[in-house]
């Protein structure tokens, strides 16, 4: 028999011992000779615990998190075992391409085998949108709209007496995926190059988007709020759109039934507007990696665990449900068919874009981003502001590469 250690970050129910032990029991019913001990990490101290364990030669066999840790950090440091043999042709066909591309490095070595995902989106107060006759600009089945339709919706709400339609919040990095996504999507810009080596916010498409948002009445650059504050202002009716949204927000029932504002207006989740009709959403991907501790038996046992939990057709649905997120495999189907909100939201998974959070200099880029938005909001020329952003972010990327 073999014993392996799994360390998991709090990814939905994967941070709950009762839930995880249930999954381990299912694994042991099929593989009784592999003993799995689990340790639960948090996001405050987890990275330090893992790094200390790596330095001390006592890293866990398995870890559950996302590509920015498994591929871009520990994978790049050479402490992970490649999982190329798990990535069969069938797996590559079944798993979303945007997820697959995030799980390997530029050499093609896979350091993550994914289980679940989510996508961040935006939301509108559909009651108010209908009130001003702007629902004509929205494809309610696909949850998509054009950039022109978005701007016409903002204009209709503004002229309808809603002075604060939306906010480009920039007091800090909280919720910054929303401001990146609205700016990148409007005219087809990107946040980084495809190879994830440099930041590209100074492209003509991005400059046009930032300038348009700055010049649009009803959209205000607000250096006093971050994403969480924006959500509060959207829920209480101050704002009619939110750029910081996801399934957790859509399902939240703290102040009213899920899907309703505090006053009972309908909250409708939307993909970010595009000129092309092809939205690219930011998101999260979570799965498993294996630390190479030099013990082939443990690596093999850890791979057996991954295959059972994340690839076995009879098991994978329960593994994903435990996460409260969405499957990365198309074959799993709609696991939330009996939950209208979750089922409808699953449409957004097909819109997941490039997972660029694995670009070097990421921490610096995030700080430089909200600083750039603040400078634009206070009147600095957009081209000057984005040049400072890319200069500083790319200097950090070069230093880390």
Stretches with model-predicted labels:
Residues 314-316, 326-333, 347-401:
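Conserved C-terminal helix/tail region of periplasmic/extracytoplasmic solute-binding proteins
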Residues 84-96, 139-143, 166-170, 189-208, ...:
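Short, solvent-exposed loop/beta-turn-alpha elements that line the ligand-binding surface or hinge
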Residues 151-158, 195-225:
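Glycine-centered hinge/linker elements that transmit conformational signals in sensory
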Residues 40-49, 68-69, 143-149, 222-236:
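Short helix-initiation/N-cap motifs at beta->coil->alpha
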Residues 1-72, 77, 91-92, 136, ...:
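Conserved N-terminal structural module of periplasmic/extracytoplasmic solute-binding proteins
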Residues 66-121, 148, 264-273, 335-340, ...:
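Hinge/lid segment of periplasmic solute-binding proteins
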Residues 106-115, 120, 146-198, 239:
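Extracytoplasmic/periplasmic solute-binding protein
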